[in-house]
A protein has these predicted regions:
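Alpha-helical tetratricopeptide repeat
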Residues: 1-84
């Protein structure tokens, strides 16, 4: 198994244990991007953003900023492919 695929599997396992943890979805999005699966990566970014919006806990400003940047990148990709 490829190293990146193994990392995705580990991310999947971590998310299965704590699905409401936005940073895990962010991490999986990064690895999926490296694997070239932009659509799944963007789905994970959207999930992470949604989790942050629903969170009653203080939000890490760096995590929030990183997700905003990734979300913009996803929107740009959708615009370029004509799906947005």
């Amino acid at each position: 198994m490829d190293d990146l695929e193994l990392i995705v599997k580990r991310c999947d396992e971590a998310i299965e244990q704590t699905p409401d943890q936005a940073d895990l979805h962010r991490d999986r999005a990064l690895v999926l991007t490296l694997l070239g699966d932009q659509a799944k990566a963007c789905d994970n970014v959207a999930t992470a953003v949604s989790l942050l919006k629903r969170s009653s806990q203080p939000v890490d400003p760096m995590l929030q900023h990183e997700l905003q940047v990734r979300q913009s990148s996803c929107k740009q990709s959708r615009t370029m492919t004509g799906s947005d």
